[in-house]
Regions:
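TPR/TPR-like (Sel1-like) alpha-helical repeat modules
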Residues: 102-114, 166, 180-194
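Flexible helix-coil transition and linker loops at the boundaries of alpha-helical arrays
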Residues: 29-37, 68-78, 113-120, 146-152
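Short coil/turn linking the two alpha-helices of tandem helical-hairpin repeats
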Residues: 74, 96, 116, 130, ...
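"A position-specific structural signal for the A-helix of alpha-solenoid helical repeats
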Residues: 6, 10, 45, 80-87, ...
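N-terminal alpha-helical interaction modules that lie
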Residues: 1-41, 45-46, 51, 149, ...
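Helix-turn-helix repeat elements of alpha-solenoid scaffolds
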Residues: 12-26, 52-65, 99-106, 131-139, ...
């Protein structure tokens, strides 16, 4: 593993000593390969968790590990690149760095909307519209976890909901979910996960 990467991960443990951060860092160190779906997923999750804990600079540094990787046809790998781009986009939007926001969005669009032939692009656009209308939410899963009193499971589903909302926010908004509503929903999930971060174990 690159020395700078190792230093970054060690710095994260100092800033965020909670078990979930130690777990993600251990996963990254165990098999540090950008061709590994598991490594990429752990990097994406670590980036999102850092944003949740208001560690924006560290989140950007983690995102920078993979945000320049090109799409090679494996969506299981690239969905994690997409994930860190959405975190970057939100941070840059808060800072008023609009050109960087545009770059993040274009990178996502080039793969999710405009990659492949016309038939694939049509399918991609249909899926995109469903996502932007909230059809990818995890509200039922969250409710079931609440009803069963399973806090750890609720945190997990809320984390996935949080990442879904970040994607929608990075891609703009829709009639059903304008920017103001998305920002409010993102903040709600962010606060809940941060409050219960010691119980997170996914």
């Amino acid at each position: 593993m690159d020395t700078q990467v190792e230093m970054l991960l060690d710095n994260i443990l100092v800033a965020c000593p909670q078990k979930i951060f130690a777990k993600k860092i251990k996963q990254i160190k165990k098999k540090h390969s950008f061709k590994s779906k598991d490594t990429m997923q752990s990097i994406r999750e670590l980036c999102s968790l850092l944003y949740i804990m208001d560690q924006e600079e560290l989140a950007l540094q983690v995102a920078n590990l993979i945000d320049k990787l090109e799409y090679k046809g494996d969506m299981r790998i690239w969905m994690n690149v997409n994930g860190v781009l959405t975190v970057e986009s939100l941070i840059y939007a808060k800072r008023g760095e609009n050109e960087k926001v545009k770059i993040c969005r274009k990178t996502i669009e080039d793969v999710y909307l405009y990659y492949g032939d016309e038939d694939r692009q049509r399918v991609n656009m249909k899926v995109f519209k469903r996502v932007m209308n909230g059809e990818g939410f995890y509200l039922e899963e969250i409710k079931r976890a609440q009803d069963s009193g399973d806090l750890k499971l609720e945190i997990f589903w809320r984390f996935l909901q949080f990442e879904e909302l970040l994607y929608m926010r990075a891609m703009g908004d829709s009639e059903a979910y304008p920017i103001e509503k998305l920002d409010s929903m993102i903040e709600e999930e962010k606060q809940f996960i941060a409050m219960h971060i010691d119980k997170a174990s996914f």
